[in-house]
């Protein structure tokens, strides 16, 4: 691999945290104690932690300095007004409602806009997003293009909405039963795949023609903007900031987890242009999150979010961010490790069904088994994103069976170097040579809701990796 393709990290390291790596027997005991669920491992038990990029970012010196400007007033914190001003400028929406994280924004949006019997279309489900939609009585309908479900389909914009599917849903149930379309930029479970600006425009036109709102899941919007700049004709000379602003000009609002592209450890917000929705949302924030000028966040964290959102739109940063993902993907792909292609904006998704093709998706849970095996073998923590994450149908109780059965190798922002990624790649490549020795799993405890967070399992064959 030509390292000249990959520029070094565009930052200097001012503070370090020691990393410990448990020995093999300690790792085997740790994953057993965690019920073979990587979510239940302790942080100190993980050598390299790729569980998520949510809230695991390294903040900059400017953000740390901003913490000292924290105004912790119960009402009217000046940090909120800085955040509000920043979001209005960069996103273009009229109203900003702070929440403790993206999940809080999802809850408010779903509670205020959905009524029982509604349908919410979107470009692939996300776990918590669909939960809030279904909890409030809606049915989620996937209207992403078919190629998004094919790990080997190579497209520049694999997260696009299929306009024919969207129109078919409108014809089937009526626009009055569709409060909004949830447009994720990027699409997490498709592999961090982006949506083109042309597709966003077309979706906006179709939705607004029928009186349907366009609500973005804006969590990784900066990564999406980078792909538009580098892949879509006519945007190569536009700044990331300009692209983000245009992107959101086609929508009516967004939910945002500040724990991703705001480069912070906590926080989120809900945006909208509808004044009535804003008034009702602030009322709900008071009930569940806090005052409308802090929404469950400390003032210092709102300040860090405002600074981080600007930093994330600096080209040197976002280029390095996406290239780290590409670097890891190219190493795995060159060794024949099956993965979702092309690599996305925040993670590499290893195709667990192809990796462990001796296991049955419905009864052996290959993604859950592979995530546990990667940890036991190397100390690297990853995340299951397959049938366990998909959960059960709220009406029938049957498992949702996703076409993609993956583990997610999620790269925290500004945390790991290329040397760390080399270790991850080498470990997974070695494990791939031992893949036939990995056992399937069975349930020991299945929670009723969002089961992937706290569910517990055990190997069907007694040991997870035979002879290891």
UniProtKB/Swiss-Prot annotation:
Keyword Lyase applies: yes
One Gene Ontology molecular-function label: tyrosine phenol-lyase activity
Membrane-spanning intervals of the chain: none
Gene Ontology biological-process entries: tyrosine metabolic process
EC main group: lyase
Coiled-coil stretches noted in the UniProt entry, renumbered to this chain: none
Family: Belongs to the beta-eliminating lyase family.
Protein name: Tyrosine phenol-lyase
Biological classification of the source: Bacteria, Bacillati, Bacillota, Clostridia, Lachnospirales
